[in-house]
């Protein structure tokens, strides 16, 4: 088994450190809307706001911390890399994704721009059937353009749909962007939900062996929650 075979798994990681949630939310609200991110690849400017679930903000981009994030939240700045056994310099991009308090229902089907799929929930009070996953028909080894920010159905993905098992309100996890697309579903509007993308690590092909081992070991440990890619029947 390799990370390519795994569509989703919780990661065996240290607990999320304590941080000031209200201060964090305000940082995202104050900084996200005014950030000018070079060559940004997220869909926040492309998708109908009614379908876009997040108040997106960049804590780090191109290897540089934004708006003193690392000084205001030093415990998180360290944790974002250490949770995956990485060094701070390994991580070039950190995207913060608090769900809009007014958002309800299903967002849009998509794959994220990064290949490594390192994720975490700093807080998630809406865990049941809230992260939906559909596998691709082909076992891709690089990120296919056919599943970038797709709305509705796609001829390139299977009909089967999984609901990711969230095992904790604060959870580190892996999410495959090569062999699956996913969508966020909000069942409890107003419930606090903060996801984080740990990105800028390059391709899946160049993933560090230690990180590959962590993902595979985690899928084995959390086998009741892990979702694996299988061919369409």
Could you tell me what each predicted segment is?
Residues 1-87:
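Non-heme Fe(II)/2-oxoglutarate
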């Amino acid at each position: 088994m390799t990370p390519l075979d795994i569509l989703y798994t919780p990661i065996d990681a240290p607990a999320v450190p304590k941080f000031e949630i209200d201060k964090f939310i305000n940082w995202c609200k104050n900084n996200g809307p005014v950030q000018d991110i070079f060559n940004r690849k997220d869909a926040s400017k492309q998708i109908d706001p009614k379908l876009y679930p997040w108040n997106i903000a960049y804590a780090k981009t191109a290897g540089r911390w934004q708006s003193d994030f690392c000084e205001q939240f030093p415990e998180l700045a360290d944790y974002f890399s250490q949770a995956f056994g990485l060094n701070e310099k390994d991580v070039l991009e950190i995207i913060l994704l608090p769900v809009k308090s007014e958002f309800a229902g299903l967002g849009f089907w998509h794959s994220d721009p990064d290949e490594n799929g390192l994720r975490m929930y700093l807080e998630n009070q809406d865990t049941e059937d809230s992260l939906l996953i559909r596998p691709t028909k082909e076992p891709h080894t690089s990120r296919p353009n056919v599943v970038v920010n797709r709305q509705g159905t796609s001829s390139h993905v299977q009909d089967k749909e999984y609901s990711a098992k969230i095992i904790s309100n604060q959870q580190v996890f892996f999410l495959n962007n090569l062999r699956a697309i996913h969508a966020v579903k909000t069942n409890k509007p107003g419930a606090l939900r903060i996801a984080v993308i740990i990105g800028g690590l390059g391709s899946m092909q160049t993933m560090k062996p230690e990180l590959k081992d962590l993902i595979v070991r985690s899928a084995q440990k959390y086998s009741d929650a892990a979702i694996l890619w299988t061919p369409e029947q």
